[in-house]
Design a protein with these regions (language model features):
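Donor-binding and catalytic core of enzymes assembling or modifying cell-surface/extracellular glycoconjugates
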Residues: 16, 203-207, 211-300
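Short catalytic/ligand-binding loop motif for oxyanion handling, primarily in non-cytosolic enzymes
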Residues: 18, 39, 45-51, 154-155, ...
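Conserved aromatic-histidine-acidic binding/catalytic patches
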Residues: 10-18, 197-201, 258
């Protein structure tokens, strides 16, 4: 097998944000450990419900190609990046065949921690993911594939300059059309989020965020970059909405000066590798901004480059968020009961809580619809397209 390798696998249907976290974390761990780096499932990179083109706008080095089996044996090499962009812009990622089979490598699953609670059907059935850094990643043995969330900044912070090079956008796609001193881009996540009361950020979050941005610059203007233009128009009527090919959405975020973000992984690396970003606001408690009483879902998503806005519109530094979370852990019954499913009367209460939350969520959607039909528009709206 030769020199040892540390790597990860790009999974079918996985979003680009999650794939980039897996890639960056595994590559940084390999660098830290002095191992070769490799990836399995390279044909799945940047192929999902939003785009089928693959990673055409970056020349990513995917490391050693770790072979995965098909019903006829190995997946054919033609399915993988060749190191040279094709005429249509696809296949721009470099890969090197290593002869290593996936089944020859150890599998390591990042440690998880989940709360089973009544905040949603998902949290009742699958649990709410709240885990932080898994320190074991830093001492993994050679020839290991890493799986998991892998989104803690402590996995990769020391290699930020290298990450900028690894994720450099090809010049022909790297436009600064929306790099303006008084323009803030809202990255609104719609899609499957719109049916989840624990996830989908309310109109109030965005209005308070815009108000906070106006404190930085009273003349701040706003546009939306989203995967779901219909949801964006319904939630925030009056703001210009943009949704284009994957490269344009990514680059608009990367080259912005101001960002108001949703609880989605997609925007992190555009922000993290940006040379233009001056301020970014993200939802406090991340994926449970709407319902948390102090826990983070997950604490991996407390990042040094963001300020975090709570439900009342107050802003917190990453350091303040970590300090609050550590204090919460010492007194919260949730951490004491992590991993335990509710039973009996407690389970019945959780189901009732979940139904009430869904009911309130859909009543709020009805209210949004009524106000929109009555002509309400975002007070900060201005067409800057």
């Amino acid at each position: 097998m030769g020199a040892g390798v540390i790597g990860t696998e790009f999974l079918k249907g996985q979003g680009l944000g999650n794939q980039l976290f897996s890639y960056v974390t595994a590559r940084c761990i390999a660098l830290e450990r002095g191992c070769a780096f490799g990836t399995a499932g390279q044909e799945q990179l940047a192929v999902n419900i939003h785009s089928k083109k693959g990673m055409y706008f970056m020349d990513m080095d995917l490391g050693e190609r770790i072979e995965t089996g098909t019903k006829d044996g190995l997946a054919p090499a033609a399915e993988y990046g060749t190191g040279t962009a094709a005429a249509d812009g696809s296949g721009a990622c470099a890969a090197r065949s290593s002869g290593v089979r996936k089944e020859e490598l150890r599998r390591y699953d990042e440690k998880e921690l989940r709360f089973f609670q009544g905040t949603s059907v998902h949290d009742m059935e699958h649990g709410c993911y709240v885990a932080g850094e898994d320190g074991a990643l830093h001492s993994l043995p050679d020839n290991t594939l890493i799986y998991g969330n892998m989104q803690d900044e402590r996995y990769f912070a020391r290699y930020r300059e290298q990450i900028r090079e690894w994720l450099r956008v090809r010049p022909e796609y790297d436009t600064h059309e929306f790099t303006r001193d008084n323009l803030c881009i809202l990255n609104l996540r719609g899609g499957e989020y719109t049916g989840h009361p624990e996830l989908y950020l309310s109109r109030g979050y965005w209005l308070k965020g815009m108000k906070n941005m106006r404190k930085i610059r009273p003349d701040m203007e706003f546009i939306i970059v989203t995967d779901d233009p219909e949801a964006a128009h319904k939630l925030l009527p009056g703001l210009p909405v943009y949704h284009s090919d994957l490269d344009r959405d990514y680059v608009m975020l990367k080259n912005a000066r101001y960002l108001l973000l949703s609880n989605s992984s997609f925007a992190f690396f555009p922000a993290y590798t940006s040379d233009t970003l001056q301020a970014a606001i993200a939802p406090k408690y991340w994926a449970r901004h709407n319902v948390s009483d102090g826990y983070w879902a997950s604490e991996q998503n407390i990042y040094s480059i963001f300020q975090y806005q709570d439900r009342s519109g107050r802003l917190f530094t990453p350091e303040e968020c970590r300090q609050e979370l550590e204090a919460y852990k010492k007194t919260s019954g949730k951490y004491k009961n992590a991993g335990k499913r509710p039973e009996g009367m407690k389970a019945a209460w959780c189901r009732l809580e979940s139904r009430v939350r869904y009911g309130m969520f859909y009543l709020r959607k009805i209210w949004y619809s009524l106000t929109r039909r009555a002509g309400w528009k975002v007070p900060y709206g201005k067409n800057v397209g």
